[in-house]
Amino acid sequence: MKFGKELSSQMVQEWQQAYVNYDYLKTLLKEIIKLKEKTNPPPPPHHAVPGEGISRKMTLYRAFSGLVQTPGKKRQSSRQSNYSSEIDIEEGKAPILVSKSTHGLETTFLMTAEEGGEYELVFFRRLDDEFNRVEKFYKEKVEEVMKDAIMLNKQMDALIAFRVKVENPVGWGWEERTVEMTRLASDIATSTAAIAASTPARTRTMNPRAQAHMEAIQEGSFSRENEDEDHGSVRGATGDVKTSSLNTMRGARPAPIEVLDHIKINNTKATPRSTIKGVLNSSSQNEIIFNRQNLNEVEEKLKFAFVEFYQKLRLLKSYSFLNVLAFSKILKKYDKITSRNASKSYMKMVDNSYLGSSDELMKLIQRVESTFIKHFANGHRRKGMNILRPQMKREKHRVTFSTGFSAGCIFSLIVALVAIIRTRKTMPEAEHNTYMNTMFPLYSLFGFIVLHITMYAIDIYYWKRYRVNYAFIFGCKQGTELGYRQVLFLGFTIGTFALLCVLGNLDMEVNPKTKNFKPLTELLPLFLLVALFVVLIMPFHFLYRSTRFFFLTCLLHCLAAPLYKVTLPDFFLGDQLTSQVQALRSINFYICYYGWGDFKKRQNTCEASEIYIYSLYIVASLPYLSRLLQCMRRMIEERSLDQGYNGVKYLLTVIAVSLRTAYGYEVKNTKNPTSHLKVLAGSSSILAAVFCTYWDFVHDWGLLNKTSKNRWLRDKLLIPQKKVYFIAMILNVVLRFAWLQTILNFEFEFLHKQTTLAVVASLEIMRRGMWNFFRVENEHLNNVGKFRAFKSVPLPFNYDEDDEKDD
């Protein structure tokens, strides 16, 4: 793989504009190559010289010079070449002169008088610009993580004091304990010098389990530097040992418990309890309660904060390494093209720069590792490093095979189903309408689920193809996000079992042996639905447990809106539910059909119940009400008026859906429906559809920008073909108005009414799948524009001084 592709594949996608523009520098080198080819014609082809083969063959009998050359065995030619190159650099004969100024790195090209020198001068100017830009960005990010490190230091002080308070509520007698520890350090200073000479370093380190959590942060004792000191020479003077012992004992003192007087528990209002307390302005909401439950919550929050902070450090380390490597590669290409030796002096300056010498960052990484292992992994290095550096998932061949196998099963079952319906009369014509009004809504639920999962898998495929960091956008834990193969496997598996149930149902209808067990025949879709629900909530580690629980958590947040803090996965799932209104109605029909015993006689008496009719309004409006409440909470917390307008969009949709439901019920139960209800349903639906379409294009997709360099689109596009965006907008409008069928009562003669409703619902799901890609693409480009590659993590403690700054 060429380095340009390797760089683009390994870079942090949200920082892609901050990396060195390697392709642009290569274009400058290509211009130099073109100039060289014009001025210097290619050399004539090489012809073999008589005796050349013999002389080359004679070299096979020379004495072996060794794999590693010693100074005495170096050849004279290499010594002369090394000497000449050193002279070139030392005497100023190098082609460039690199210096450091207040504006950054500046390179003076010393051979502009040569032919084509102006092209090389432009190359080095652009190279300096790229380096200074990269180093400036790197400095800013390092300063940010250093500020975060200071904040984490304060959080660790508070955590240790909190831990001491919980595990020793009576108190330790801090002043007396300090005096005793100081006196003890003085008494054992002399004996320590003798013991240290004969005791290994690992044995000298005190490691009582009871005090492992109580001592102050002394992770530096585990660093390589101190290990080297332990294996070095033994101190000879007693005074040195006494001083080191005093410092060690002073560092081993417990954290000052007075820290707890200056902190408060950070109430993020992320749960219903904290939200209700925040609304009621409870005076005790920030009071610290010292118990084991609060300690565990604080440790979990701080543990998550350390994991995210460590990921920041790793990304910065990768950023530094890739950019330094890019400068090295491009300079080697320059040397090869121009036959100069400019890379040595330039890379020497790069290595000595802030970007090249990342010692401060490396020490911080080691410090974070040792701190995390000690305080959050109980001293187990492997356990701690597995949390800090989760292993990347490998694509398994059995997943690909299972996906293809299940897809083949679906295709075969569909062919078999069509053949059975066409060739065998499974039921009389009179029972066909009853079957479509009862069993079809039950089985269509699985069709909606499979179609939505398939559309999501297609989205994942194209997100990966265009390098959209969807895992970061959705907040997935590293290594737990599903690929499109895994998602397709889930969807095709559900589809296979659903089609098996349909075929089983039809077979039991015509089989004389099973025809008497009609209630059992009707229960097949219910069994499948219950099985899917059981698998979804099963706590065992199989079938993507983390993803299942992540989905259930987001679903709970949608149902309990606005009590939970709204995150992108929550409102993204809420938008998906707005496209599954027909599926929610199917679930409502499940409750009615099986709860009231209609399945025993295959009768649909649900529509005769007022409770069921009212539930249709609630079920159809529930997803939009959830999104409305989420928008209201975001408007209050973020003080964003756009969220208020977004809430108006969902309010209009709730009104439109309710009026369409009422009109559909009136059409079904009365011969002459009132015209004013039709007008209200149609006008409200048109108003809501126009508002939603405008919001999709402008806010969710970021399109229709007149001033953009891509007219009527946006400045940055991941798909190079602009026509794709215009086609998507047209399709979105067409599919958005698919609900017109419910108002105009337009029906196809060859389709049953339930089939028509299923087709319209499927079109809405397909529109949502298309919407998903461009919505996440726009979110990714916003992250790229703001260089946002990290998640903001709430910390468990607030210091009084921080509150004063906020005030």
Swiss-Prot record:
Extracellular side residue ranges read: 422-437, 507-522, 700-723
What is the induction note for this entry?
Not induced by Pi deficiency.
Give the SPX domain ranges: 1-348
Q: State where the protein is found.
A: Cell membrane
Does the entry feature the keyword Transmembrane helix, yes or no? yes
Please list the coiled coil stretches. none
Residue ranges occupied by any EXS domain in the UniProt entry: 607-807
Specify where the region named Disordered lies, as residue ranges. 219-248
* Tissues and organs where the protein is expressed, per its UniProt entry: Expressed at low levels in roots and leaves.
Q: Which UniProt keywords apply?
A: Cell membrane, Membrane, Phosphate transport, Transmembrane, Transmembrane helix, Transport
Q: Which InterPro entries match?
A: EXS_C (IPR004342), PHO1_SPX (IPR034092), SPX_dom (IPR004331)
- Give the way it sits in the membrane: Multi-pass membrane protein
Query: Quick one: where is this thing mainly located?
Result: membrane
Q: Which GO CC annotations does the UniProt entry carry?
A: plasma membrane
Q: Which residues lie on this side of the membrane: Cytoplasmic?
A: 1-400, 459-485, 544-678, 745-807
Q: Which residues cross the membrane?
A: 401-421, 438-458, 486-506, 523-543, 679-699, 724-744
Bridged cysteine pairs (disulfide): none
**Task performed by this protein:** May transport inorganic phosphate (Pi).
Tell me the PANTHER family matching this sequence. PHOSPHATE TRANSPORTER PHO1 HOMOLOG 2, XENOTROPIC AND POLYTROPIC RETROVIRUS RECEPTOR 1-RELATED
To which protein family does this belong? Belongs to the SYG1 (TC 2.A.94) family.
Q: What is this protein called?
A: Phosphate transporter PHO1 homolog 2
| Native species | Arabidopsis thaliana
